Structure formats: structure tokens, C-alpha cells
Amino acid sequence: MLKAIKIRLYPTKTQQITINKLLGCCRLVYNLCLEHRNKIYEETKESGSLSTSYKYFCELKEMEKYSFLKTDSHSKVIQQTLMNQDVAFKNFFTKKSDFPKFKSKKDKQSCRFPKDAISSIKGNRINIIKSLKDIHFKCSRKDESYLNKNQRLISSATLIKTCSGKYYFSILIDRPNEVRFNKTNNIVGIDLGIKDLIITSNGEKFENKQFYRKQENKLKTLNRKFTKTQNGSNNHQKIRVKIAKLNEKIKNQRLWYIHHIVNQLLNENQVIVMEDLNVSGMMQNHKLSKSIQDVSFCELKQILQYKASWNDKQVVFIDRFYPSSKTCHCCGYKNDSLQLSDREWVCPECGVIHDRDINAAKNILEEGKRIIGLSSPEFKRVGEQAMASSMNLEQNVKY
């Protein structure tokens, strides 16, 4: 299985200059070739091809203005850059993404290396290309040992410079899958929210830490200072890095918390049922959009899915239009008058007092069990045994 090992690089000042030149060349070639393909599209209504971009790059190298591309860039890295651009165009024409955009040196920068570009890894030192040798790096001891012993299994690698000025090297390597979590007979339904990030059908609630909200005032202060500084000045650059570091801190805190929650859910349950939320549609509500961005539902869903697949667990999605909050999990009565502001409601049929979110999680669980009980081909039990019928499932599964 191909997995990425992300290591932190600590290059010297000379190595930083070399890396920055390489990233700058990739960005320049990408932007110039993008401009060239845009002109072709305007004139002929054709997007061009990879060979068109590479031919134009060869012409650029011969110009005196761009003669530095011969010395500061690397041919295989430029090839990968142009291949990425070609993929971006194909995704646009197949309506998978927006039109390719020009790259800025103020954003996160990256360039991709093929597997033969990494010459050797010895201890905590890595040699990438001739101009980038003996770079110090840090990662876990387990990852460092695996990289030293299995360099031949490397598929590709990506050099990354963050907005805060940190350098990383993400190495894609063939690695055996390690199952971290125990197999259980438990199934749980989860409801995603804003006040509480996750509410389970067992009544457990995971708090929304609101990492962005806690740093919002500090970010506003830095942004005000940033707008008052002169563009290109030292103070302008210093404050820009401070803003980038604070945003990076918020992102890392949120990511750590999501991993912590996902690990607990997967360690305790074999099957997890959740709603297939339309996050882009929810973002249209301007009153909730900032809070939805802060909880990062998409990140949570992505991490839960890939960790479940690595650990022989199953994630089941129910229809986004299923009325999980409005339906009484005891008698099935549907309360159409329920508003978003109603956190508790009393069922007029059976008289049960419902916590809105816990009730939704229990309904999600029951709907997930119904879907699994259909034995449709897209829902197979993870593990050695086939998924039992809904009757057997209720006997074997704790909820």
C-alpha cells in the first residue's frame, strides 16, 4: 500500500537558497506555460497538450531573459510541474475542478520529484539531487528506520515550503498496512454539529473546540497591522509570516483534535454510520459559514474514511435528506414543525423528551442498520465474515 511519510527538513541557508530557486523556477514555468495555453485556447478554442507546454519550455530556456532555467531548475521536476498543469486542464474540461490558476510565491509552494531523484537516505540526512545533498531532517524513529531500510520502495516525493517558511518533504512509499485498532462487534451512529462537533447514538458528545474563534481577535489585530505596512518592507514580511504561523497553528490544532476523535471512534466501533452532508450547500448560510469552516466537516469525513479502510472498519453514509432530527426514534413520529433553534422537543405521540442531536444520532444508527441489512453490493462487512442479516445484526451488535 502506498503511504506518505512527511518529514521536516532543516536546510542550511545555502540549501534554502537552492530550494527557493528551484521552487521559483517551477512556479515561473507553470505560470508562463499557463499563459501560453490560455492564448492558444482564446485563439483556437483548444486547450493544447503536455507536448505543447514542454515545447514552449524548451523555447524559454533558449531566451537570454530566462537563461537561469538551465542552471537553477531540474529537468525531471519541471516535467512533473507541466504534467500537474496538464492534469489540472483535464480536470477543468471534465468539470472536476475550476480553471487552473496562476501560482503566487506568497502561497504554499511545492514541486514533485520522481523516485530516481532521491539518491540516498542515511540516518537523518537525505540527498535529493546533486545541488541538494546532506539535508538534515526529522521524523519519528519508526519512519526514519523504515526509510533507511526501504529506499527502493519510494514511488515519488514532494518538496513543500509553507507560507510560514517551513520546509517539508512528503515521500510516497510502498508500506505494509498495519492494523492499529481492535475488531469489535459495535456499531454507532454519529451526528455532526456546530455546538458539539460529534454526537454519538450512545449519548457521548465531543466538544467543538472552536480553534479559529479563540484566535480570531489576534488574527484581526495582525491583519490590521499588515494593511498599514508598506508592501515589500521588512515589517510587511514579518507580519505576513506571523499571520501564516498563526493560521498554521490553528490548522494543526484542528487536525490533531480530529485525529484524536477518529481514533477513539474506530477503536471502539466496527461500523460507523453518518450523514452524507452537503457542506458546500451549508456554507451558503452566511450566519453559520464561519462556524462550519472552523469545524471542518470535510476533513473529518476524509480522515474517518481512509483510517477506516486501513483498519478493516466500515463507514456507512445515509441519505442527506433523511429527517434524522425530526423523527422520534421511539415511535417514528415525524415533527415537521421542528426548527433549527429547538435543541429539545417532546414527542406528542409517545411523550418522550428528545435531545435533538442524540435523537438524530439514534435515527442515523437505525437507518444505517437498515441499509446494511439490505446486503447491497456497495455495503460489505469489513473483515472475514459476511455481513449478517438485520435480525442477526441486532443480536450481535451493541448499540
Question: At which residue positions do the language-model features occur?
Answer:
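Gly/serine-rich nucleotide phosphate-binding loop at the start of the catalytic core
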Residues: 1-78
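Short acidic-glycine loop/turn motifs at beta-strand connectors
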Residues: 12, 122, 162-164, 201-204, ...
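Generic recognition of long tandem-repeat/solenoid scaffolds
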Residues: 123-130, 167-171, 345-347
